Amino acid sequence: MTINALLLSSSRVGDTPYLAHAIPFIKPLTTQAQKWIFIPYAGVSMSYDTYLASVVMGLAELNLDISGIHQHPDPCQAIKDADGILIGGGNTFHLLHELYRYNLINLIREKVAQGTPYVGWSAGANVSGASIKTTNDMPIIEPPSFDALKIVPFQLNPHYSNYRTPGHNGETRAQRLLEFTKVEPLTPVIAIAEGSALWRRDNTLVLLGENPAYLFCGEQQEMLIPIGSDLSHLLK
């Protein structure tokens, strides 16, 4: 089977409606997948039912059968029965903590490797990488490990922007990612701007969307990746 995974930087771009910009990206993954399971564990500041309702509404035009994993008595069985997997944004630490809590890490990894389509945005994209060490989120809870789903073998940083607010003296995002590359100089980080996504199809990886991404790896810092770039070499 072929890995088919879409890793979105965000659920919105600019002032567009929730998930509206992502519909054209998600649609090709739904041609043979009707029954989807949504994992809302990153949504700490809202109820899981509220989160699910927003996703169902946002993706309504795709006519998918979407249920929340929290609605199922057996989360593992829900993953096994699903045609596709959706993981939303929020707090990456809480998301990963719950994936470990319910023993879903290896199961999701295996399902995706067997061809089950995967769509993740923001935190849902973060956990698709090798680890969550390059998330933007506050560590509000400690997962058993930072190791993540490893759908792609590198690091991700969604919502990327290196804007510095005038008068603000904190580190920029690029400076934070430089810190990671000093500790792990051989591990690439792909920083994805809002409105863009990575699409992995088996051994191919391409950048989709309207904004470029950036590569951080060792001495390479904030190297521009144009839209449409073939990044398949990063899968090796």
Curated annotation (Swiss-Prot):
The active site is at S122, D137, H159. GO terms for molecular function: dipeptidase activity; serine-type peptidase activity. It is found in: Cytoplasm. It catalyses: Dipeptidase E catalyzes the hydrolysis of dipeptides Asp-|-Xaa. It does not act on peptides with N-terminal Glu, Asn or Gln, nor does it cleave isoaspartyl peptides. CDD domains: GAT1_Peptidase_E (cd03146). Keywords: Cytoplasm, Dipeptidase, Hydrolase, Protease, Serine protease. GO terms for biological process: proteolysis. GO terms for cellular component: cytoplasm. Signal peptide: none annotated. Hydrolyzes dipeptides containing N-terminal aspartate residues. May play a role in allowing the cell to use peptide aspartate to spare carbon otherwise required for the synthesis of the aspartate family of amino acids. Belongs to the peptidase S51 family. PANTHER family: ALPHA-ASPARTYL DIPEPTIDASE, PROTEASE S51 ALPHA-ASPARTYL DIPEPTIDASE. This is Peptidase E. It comes from Shewanella putrefaciens (strain CN-32 / ATCC BAA-453).
